[in-house]
Amino acid sequence: MFRRPVLQVLRQFVRHESETASSLVLERSLNRVHLLGRVGQDPVLRQVEGKNPVTIFSLATNEMWRSGDSEVYQLGDISQKTTWHRISVFRPGLRDVAYQYVKKGSRIYLEGKIDYGEYMDKNNVRRQATTIIADNIIFLSDQTKEKE
């Protein structure tokens, strides 16, 4: 009794390999990045002719772990790895706020997406660049207040 309507509904969501490209349905995917770290340099505002302006800065995140073969976890040596991320802010309001208030040493939390791009360097060699495109920035500390 309900078998036919259920199958019709399921066919809307399930696609088979035999279907052609003309019947492609957009499916959801997720490209989301959450970073918490310290700013490595004051931001720069870049404007390339014919393109949107962008605020760019670097963000350091740290990963820490204990090493050693000790049975007692607390006795191992602490190791740390710092990873640097290139952050690009294109959204007009956020771009201007980031340029004005993000400072070297500030602790921030940001949300965005990862982007893999290519560009030609000065020697006409194709290079790859990974950047985080920020959608939201939360300021957790102000470096100028911490110095006082």
Swiss-Prot record:
InterPro entries: NA-bd_OB-fold (IPR012340), Primosome_PriB/ssb (IPR000424), ssDNA-bd (IPR011344). The modification N6-acetyllysine is found at residue 113. Pfam families: SSB. It is found in: Mitochondrion; Mitochondrion matrix, Mitochondrion nucleoid. Residues 1-16 form a transit peptide. Its main location: mitochondrion. Homotetramer. Interacts with MPG/AAG, through inhibition of its glycosylase activity it potentially prevents formation of DNA breaks in ssDNA, ensuring that base removal primarily occurs in dsDNA. Interacts with POLDIP2. Interacts with PRIMPOL. This is Single-stranded DNA-binding protein, mitochondrial. It comes from Pongo abelii (Sumatran orangutan). The lineage of its organism: Eukaryota, Metazoa, Chordata, Craniata, Vertebrata. The gene is SSBP1.
